[in-house]
UniProtKB/Swiss-Prot annotation:
Pfam families: CGI-121. This is EKC/KEOPS complex subunit cgi121. Component of the EKC/KEOPS complex composed of at least bud32, cgi121, gon7, kae1 and pcc1; the whole complex dimerizes. The keyword Transcription regulation applies. Belongs to the CGI121/TPRKB family. One of its GO terms (cellular component) is EKC/KEOPS complex. Component of the EKC/KEOPS complex that is required for the formation of a threonylcarbamoyl group on adenosine at position 37 (t(6)A37) in tRNAs that read codons beginning with adenine. The complex is probably involved in the transfer of the threonylcarbamoyl moiety of threonylcarbamoyl-AMP (TC-AMP) to the n6 group of a37. Cgi121 acts as an allosteric effector that regulates the t(6)A activity of the complex. The EKC/KEOPS complex also promotes both telomere uncapping and telomere elongation. The complex is required for efficient recruitment of transcriptional coactivators. It is found in: Nucleus; Chromosome, Telomere. One of its GO terms (biological process) is tRNA threonylcarbamoyladenosine modification. The lineage of its organism: Eukaryota, Fungi, Dikarya, Ascomycota, Pezizomycotina. Keywords: Activator, Chromosome, Nucleus, Telomere, Transcription, Transcription regulation, tRNA processing. Its main location: nucleus.
């Protein structure tokens, strides 16, 4: 499979981040087993893309994880498991993996790899993912994610059930609910553990 791997340089973060999005993944049980067994070749953040609202949502979790990594504040094994944990609005690591991480039934997968060593390059990550992920690569953008996101599951995970109660106030009939939801989940990521 070819990859639509994107390499990003986030503001204030010295490490490049490699991100790929896949649909119709056929080998999720294999990928999950590689993580569980601790296979160093599969040190990635494998995220169930149905739990990702937008590009900003994903990159907020990635930013938090890398920032915690750079400041020696990891609560999990490495920056990649910390990325999955960073999606969570609470401090329960196991719960974050259940809700946001890859499962045997995952069909849409967001893959994140942080270049924590010089040998992790765009080319090496692209080649490994092309060999390892049996799925259709798609662009990592808001349009694609909007077709994948399970809004009901996301609202439940972030306890935002009452968020949609505002009346429509725009000419096109929208009320900015999507933007409010995005800001709420990003706020939950930023504030986790602040109390």
């Amino acid at each position: 499979m070819s990859s639509t791997l994107e390499t990003l340089n986030l503001s204030h973060i010295p490490l490049p981040v490699h991100v790929a999005l896949y649909r119709d993944v056929q080998n999720a049980p294999f990928l999950r087993q590689q993580l569980i067994s601790g296979n160093a070749d599969f040190e990635y953040a494998f995220i169930d893309a149905s739990m990702v609202l937008s590009r900003s949502h994903a990159l907020s979790a990635v930013f938090r994880a890398i920032n915690d990594y750079l400041n020696q504040r990891l609560k999990s094994r490495n920056v990649h498991s910390e990325t999955v944990f960073s999606f969570s609005p609470n401090n329960n690591i196991a719960d974050s993996f259940r809700r946001f991480g890859i499962s045997d039934s995952t069909k849409d997968l967001l893959v994140v790899k942080v270049s924590v060593t010089p040998d992790v390059t765009h080319e090496s990550v692209a080649a490994h993912l092309a060999q390892s992920v049996e799925g259709t690569p798609v662009p990592f953008d808001d349009e694609t994610l909007s077709g994948i996101s399970d809004i009901a599951k996301i609202k439940k995970a972030y306890k935002l059930g009452a968020l949609s109660s505002a009346p429509s106030d725009k000419a096109d009939g929208t009320n900015g609910e999507d933007r409010r939801l995005e800001l709420s989940v990003i706020g939950a990521i930023a504030l986790r553990g602040a109390t």
